[in-house]
Design a protein with these regions (language model features):
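Eukaryote-biased activation of long, low-complexity terminal tails and linkers
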Residues: 1-470
Length: 470
């Protein structure tokens, strides 16, 4: 018999539909239709997700979340409070107890640190809380107490802790090294707050089962990394670090040695003055001896440019990132110029617009320079695009050029003369005068381009009139 009315659908069909909606949206949309739907929602629906995110959903959430907690607490799978306005109000109104026996994931965004401290002990009674994400906008001075409470959660596998306003070296993490009885179950740990070497090792002493570690702000609080006791994390295979303080390459090397882990994926972002980070031979030695299982390497080094500041230059041997070590692993050096920065990147090779490169001989000429800024002299009096390019040429030759900003023909010609090995060129927006009023530099550029034999492929992304380049 064909179903002619939505109401004639079986309960199981509605349960399938409910899986695509937030719990408050379900109450808002269905609970007032009739008695059947009201009872259907109150009874035993499948696991529900409760999420407060964008402002438009605030009213629906506020009007219905208490009903969800009253009637469906046992079916609640996740509670995600992303609102900057209501997180503290809602979190403080919830009584967390063992009746949340299906709750697996909690997110508290912009939660007050004192409220967080009062809630965390209550979460120990949740039998299936596997994932916890915290973002506090308070100004904590000591995060050690928060970590003690987090490590007491018996079932947690994933923890992300962000202290948005904790952006200075006044923040400390007073935490002793864990005993065997204190070790927890965390396998994925993401920390976004200041953290010194000794504090980091104290934290991970509580996580012997750690598989992935990401910390976004490693600070050097005058701590000797050599004096810290080594740690054994046999399951750690994925490590991501961001360094924004003066931590040398040698200190990083000691840190890697003391982790005693078989990393397969390593990601490093750094803004420091130590140009040893750009020494391919030092990296090769470190990876061969300390990270022999490494399969993926992601590296980002930013060289900062500013007036009245001497940007450190690399004076080592040039073109070392195209040795067999790098080519066999298909880890390719790329360079990007953004406002005030030359960014050096190493990452696995990906197909580009001009072709798929397969052989190592061709990979040796895959180094690309991308320019998001072509006229820094607009903002500074003494720094020019040529300074950025020469900084890069100290490290490597360039074979591919991409320009992601508007550029005039005269400026492009000057850049290409600095890069005689470039063989592909991709331009986002090239400004050339109309043919009837070509300026001298436009004619000179077109003549230069027509006689250029090295460049074999050119892509103009936003050319409105192709007659301009004929």
């Amino acid at each position: 018999m064909p179903i002619s009315s939505l109401e004639n659908l079986p309960n199981e069909s509605f349960y399938d539909i409910f899986e695509y909606f937030d719990a408050c949206e379900i109450y808002h949309s269905f609970s007032s239709l009739n008695h059947r739907f009201y009872q259907l929602i109150k009874s035993s629906p499948p696991l529900l997700k409760l999420r407060l995110s964008y402002p438009e959903s605030n009213e629906i959430f506020i009007n219905n979340y208490q009903k969800v907690l009253l009637f469906n607490k046992k079916q609640l799978l996740s509670l995600h409070l992303w609102s900057t306005e209501n997180t503290n109000q809602i979190a403080s109104s919830i009584i967390f107890d063992s009746s949340f026996n299906s709750l697996q994931s909690l997110i508290f965004y912009t939660i007050d640190i004192d409220l967080l401290t009062s809630i965390l002990p209550k979460l120990t009674c949740l039998p299936r809380l596997f994932s916890l994400a915290i973002d506090t906008w308070s100004h904590p001075k000591n995060l050690g107490d928060i970590y003690r409470l987090i490590f007491n959660l018996p079932k947690s596998k994933f923890v992300r802790f962000t202290a948005t306003e904790a952006d200075n070296d006044d923040v400390t993490i007073s935490l002793p090294i864990a005993t065997n009885e204190q070790m927890g179950s965390i396998e994925y740990l993401i920390m976004s707050h200041p953290c010194a070497f000794d504090e980091l090792f104290a934290i991970i002493s509580y996580t012997p089962n750690l598989r992935r570690l990401k910390f976004l702000y490693l600070s050097n609080r005058n701590v000797s990394i050599g004096s810290i006791k080594s740690m054994v994390l046999p399951n750690l295979t994925n490590l991501s670090i961001s360094i924004y303080k003066e931590i040398s390459f040698d200190e990083l090397k000691i840190f890697i040695e003391k982790l005693n882990s078989k990393l397969k994926i390593f990601s490093l972002t750094t803004i420091v003055e130590d140009v040893t980070y750009l020494d391919a031979n030092r990296w090769e030695e470190l990876i061969r001896t300390k990270l022999p299982q490494l399969e993926e390497f992601y590296f980002r080094y930013s060289a900062y440019f500013s007036e009245n500041y001497d940007t450190p230059l690399y004076f080592g041997q040039c073109n070392q990132f195209i040795s067999p070590f790098w080519l066999q692993r298909r880890w390719i050096l790329e360079i990007e110029v953004e406002f005030e920065n030359v960014i050096y990147l190493i990452r696995p090779y990906q197909k580009r617009w001009y072709e798929m490169i397969n052989g190592s001989d061709q990979l040796s000429k895959s180094i690309r320079l991308s320019l998001d800024e072509t006229c820094p002299e607009r903002w500074t009096k003494t720094i020019f695009i040529e300074d950025y390019i020469r900084h890069a040429l100290n490290l490597t030759q360039i074979y591919h050029l991409e320009i992601n900003a508007q550029i005039f023909s005269g400026k492009l010609m000057k850049i290409l003369r600095l890069l005689p090995e470039v063989n592909t060129l991709k331009i986002s927006s090239l400004s050339i005068s109309q043919s009837e009023s070509l300026f001298y530099e436009d004619i000179e550029f077109l003549d230069f381009l027509s006689n250029e034999k090295q460049i074999t492929k050119i892509c103009f992304k936003n050319m409105k009139d192709m007659n301009q380049i004929q």
